[in-house]
């Protein structure tokens, strides 16, 4: 039996199936009494030490994360980090985020101002990294390095190794 569809339609159908399966598997594995631990303040970051990663081939933005900002909480399973999105003109958007690998969710804790100080995001909530209305960098970072299926990677060292060697698996 042959099945044909427009490439864009097929890719969206496949994305929906994969995202739905992964999301349902992750939700089932999350404890009902889960509670996020106290969020550490935004860490310092160094623009000269960013490890870049590709989000989409068509994106004009360059995304990078500072490995010194990485933390993996053993109590709540959250991977926290500072991500920097840079435009072709050099403008930067610096964000302090957390990834919840067990549910495929992301939360923005703070954004950096041009002077380097942080502004806490009021009423920040966990949102699906698969939500197509959100920027894709969190999902790509989770898949490329931060999460191993529905769990965070074992260590910051492992996270850095995966970012530096994306094809080694």
Residue ranges and their predicted role:
Residues 1-7:
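N-terminal secretory signal peptides that target proteins for export/translocation
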Residues 10-21:
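Bacterial N-terminal signal peptides
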Residues 26-96:
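N-terminal secretory signal peptides
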Residues 29, 40, 107, 151-154:
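Secreted/processed peptides and extracellular or luminal domains of membrane proteins
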Residues 81, 106-110:
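Short hydrophobic/aromatic-rich beta-strand segments that constitute the beta-sheet cores
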Residues 86, 110-117:
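Short, solvent-exposed aromatic-acidic interface loops
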Residues 95-105:
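A short, surface-exposed beta-strand/turn
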Residues 119-169:
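C-terminal partner/receptor-binding element of secreted or periplasmic proteins
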């Amino acid at each position: 039996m042959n099945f044909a569809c427009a490439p864009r339609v097929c890719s969206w159908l496949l994305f929906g199936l994969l995202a739905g399966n992964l999301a349902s598997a992750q939700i089932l594995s999350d404890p009902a009494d889960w509670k996020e631990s106290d969020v550490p303040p935004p860490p310092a970051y160094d623009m000269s030490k960013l490890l870049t990663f590709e989000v989409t081939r068509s994106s004009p933005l360059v995304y990078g994360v500072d490995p010194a900002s990485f933390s993996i909480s053993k109590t709540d399973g959250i991977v926290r980090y500072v991500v920097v999105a840079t435009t072709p003109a050099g403008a930067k958007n610096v964000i302090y985020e957390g990834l919840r690998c067990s549910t495929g969710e992301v939360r923005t804790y703070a954004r950096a101002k041009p002077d380097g100080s942080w502004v806490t995001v009021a009423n920040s909530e966990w949102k699906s990294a698969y939500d197509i209305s959100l920027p894709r960098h969190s999902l790509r970072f989770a898949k490329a390095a931060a999460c191993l299926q529905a769990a965070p990677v074992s260590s910051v060292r492992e996270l850095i190794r995966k970012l530096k060697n994306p094809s080694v698996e």
